[in-house]
Structures are given as C-alpha cells and as structure tokens.
From Swiss-Prot:
This is D-galactonate dehydratase. Belongs to the mandelate racemase/muconate lactonizing enzyme family. GalD subfamily. The record marks D258 as: Increases basicity of active site His. Pathway: Carbohydrate acid metabolism; D-galactonate degradation; D-glyceraldehyde 3-phosphate and pyruvate from D-galactonate: step 1/3. Its cofactor is Mg(2+). GO terms for molecular function: galactonate dehydratase activity; magnesium ion binding.
Length: 382
C-alpha cells in the first residue's frame, strides 16, 4: 500500500482536517491545527507531504521519525501539530486495514469507560452557575471554567476577590455534588498565581490548569509545594522531551498533552507512559473537533493513568460548527452518566461526512484569538 494524496480542509469554528488517500482506496483522517495558525500548519503538512507521497502508511513509527528527525530544526507547535494530524490519519488507515479500532492495536482496553468533563463559559457567577445547571441536566458532573480574567503581573485585591468570589458562589450553589477545574490559561504571573492559589484552596477545585505559562515551568514545583490543589499543565508542550523536564522537576499532578499539537497518538502514548512512571495522571487537552477527540479517547483507553477527558460539545469557541457536525456516526460519541465508551469501529472510529467538510471548507473563517490589553495599554496574556 502507498500514500497517493494528502488533502487539507480548514473548517469552522477553528479546526483543520486532513485526508490521506492510498492506492488501495483506504482513507485516513486526522486533525492537525494550531488555533489561530491553521494556514501555517497547513503549509507544514504539505511540506511533509512531499516525502509522504509514495510511502507505505503502515510504517507509522518510521514515518514519524522521518518527519521529526529528518530536518535539522524540529519540534515546536507548528511542526508537531502537522505531525500530529498526519499520525492520527496513519493510525486511522492501519485500523481500517486490520479491521480493528486503534485501541485494540495498542494492546487493548485498560478500562470500560472514561469520565468526560465539560467547559462552562460565562463572565459572571450567575452565568456560570446557570451553565452548570444545564449541563448537569444532560449528565455532566465535572466541569472546567476560567479561573480569572486578565491579571496584571502584580494586580490588586479587587481582581483577586473577583476570581475567588465566582468560585465561592459555585461551591455554595452545588456543594460537593460537582467537581470543577480552574483554568488560569497561563494569563497569571508567578507572583499572582501564588496569591490566587492560596485564596482558592478552601473551595477545593479539582485542579488548577496552567497556573503559569509553560515557559515558566520552573514554578510548577514551587507552586505545588504551597498547595493541596493538583496542578495540571501541558497543552502548550509539544514533545516528550518537553514533558521530560517537567516530570523530572515535579509539581505537576496531571499532564495535558494535546493529541493535535504534541505529535499525535504515537507521541502522546509515550508521554502517557512517562507520566505513569512518575505517578502523574493523564487528561488530554481537547477543545477541538471530533478527530482530535477520537484520538484522545484511544489513548485514554490504553493508558492506566488517564483520569478524565476534555471535550468541546457546546464550548463557547464553537461558532459556525459544533463538535459532531462533520460526523456521521454521532451515536458512537454518546455519553452515559458523563462517561465516554470506547469507539468500536475500525481505525479512529469516526465516520466523516466528507461532503459537508468540502462544503464548509469553502468559506472557512481565519480564527484568531482575541488581543487583550491592560488598562495602561500594554499587551495582556489571553
């Protein structure tokens, strides 16, 4: 079998799919994207395509190594996201050839179901509480929400109180009937992260995500030493080599590699194994589309340390398309009691509505993340 063609489709809301075709008619789908940089990743995919056309898609490990090691400069969000989507599609092809789901090819199930959590938007406590109530009505009991708005390097007590007040009202409204993680989104400086984490401790969030930027990872063990709240990080780390340094330093309780950013299934399964050796949980980052989610689920179901799975149904970013709008077999993604079951169809287990993909790709938006500024006019972290 040989790879004959690679096609990319930029899609709403902020996704990109790729299709790898073979000379035997078997097709694989992947989802390579950096949100806000889809065109750049698309160019990288097609640069890799110059080598991949004519190659045997079954040699996933070799093709991965060529893409990663074949150039003098390597790594980073663009290259690793391009590799990630290609890798997903190659696994999809292999599963279809062997008539088995990807998790079966990776050694089989270690669990029967995986807990999902849902994003909750809203700028005011009442909006967040209302959103949680609606999601509880469809079976969710675990959530993630923004821990704060933009915050200065050294901010005032009003900003701290506003963040804490939201969390306090949520805990008061629901008690311990729900669990929620707080995403600092890397928008908090190390000094302010210390303050916020201390103030939030009484409300027992499930985790604090990206308390500081990945560039400031040396603060993870320092922050962890002052709190009982688990620290989660990893969505802006792109290879096992970056995760290696974080694991060796300690402090992070949950790793969150993104299957569409960190080298795909091949790389993230290795990252999961490294995390297990350090007694660190796995919770793949996934605010993206259905192919990315499917890839995450296959890794979850073969990784003993997977604890829960993010998914983007109803997320506030999804303007122009929802998670399953491009999927024919929507029923396979149904959750029971807030849990995903294994995907059972061959390959990734996602049947893509190609006609709809082609149609909506004709006018795909060029999504960009917002640009925030502080009161003094300087740029703030989004």
């Amino acid at each position: 079998m040989k790879i004959t063609n690679i096609t990319t489709y930029r899609l709403p809301p902020r996704w990109m799919f790729l299709k790898i075709e073979t000379d035997e008619g078997i097709v694989g789908w992947g989802e390579p994207v950096i949100e806000g940089r889809a065109r750049t990743v698309e160019a990288a995919v097609h640069e890799f395509g110059d080598y991949l056309i004519g190659q045997d898609p079954a040699r996933i490990n070799d093709l991965w190594q060529v893409m990663y090691r074949g150039g003098f400069y390597r790594g980073g969000p663009i290259m690793m996201s391009a590799i990630a989507g290609i890798d997903q599609a190659l696994w999809d092809i292999k599963g279809k050839v062997l008539n088995a789901p990807v998790w079966q090819l990776m050694g089989g199930l270690v669990r029967d179901k995986i807990k999902a959590y849902s994003w909750v938007g809203g700028d005011r406590p009442a909006e967040v509480i209302d959103g949680i109530k609606k999601l509880r009505g469809i079976g969710f009991d675990t959530f993630k929400l923004n821990g704060c708005e933009e915050m200065g390097i050294i901010d005032n007590s009003r900003a701290v109180d506003a963040a804490v007040n939201t969390v306090a009202q949520i805990r008061e409204a629901f008690g311990n009937e729900i669990e929620f993680g707080l995403d600092f989104h890397g928008r908090v400086s190390a000094p302010m992260a210390k303050v916020l984490i201390k103030e939030l401790e009484p409300y027992r969030p499930l985790f604090i995500e990206e308390p500081v930027l990945a560039e400031q990872a040396e603060y993870y063990p320092r922050l962890a030493a002052q709190t009982h709240i688990p620290i989660a990080a990893g969505e802006r780390m792109f290879s096992r080599f970056e995760f290696k340094r974080v694991l060796e330093a300690g402090g992070v309780a949950i790793l969150q590699p993104d299957l569409s950013h960190a080298g795909g299934i091949t790389e993230c399964y290795k990252i999961a194994g490294m995390a297990e050796a350090y007694d660190v949980g796995l919770a793949p980052h996934c605010p993206l589309g259905p192919i990315a989610l499917a890839a995450c689920l296959h890794v979850d179901f073969v990784s003993h340390n997977a604890v829960f799975q993010e998914q983007s149904m109803g997320i506030h970013y999804n303007k122009g398309a929802e998670l399953l709008d491009f999927v024919k077999n929507k029923e396979d993604f149904n959750m029971e009691g807030g849990f995903f079951k294994p995907l059972m169809k061959p390959g990734l287990g996602v049947e893509i509505d190609e006609a709809r993909v082609i149609e909506l790709s004709k006018n795909a938006p060029d999504w960009r993340n917002p640009l925030w500024r502080y009161e003094d006019g300087s740029v703030a972290e989004w």
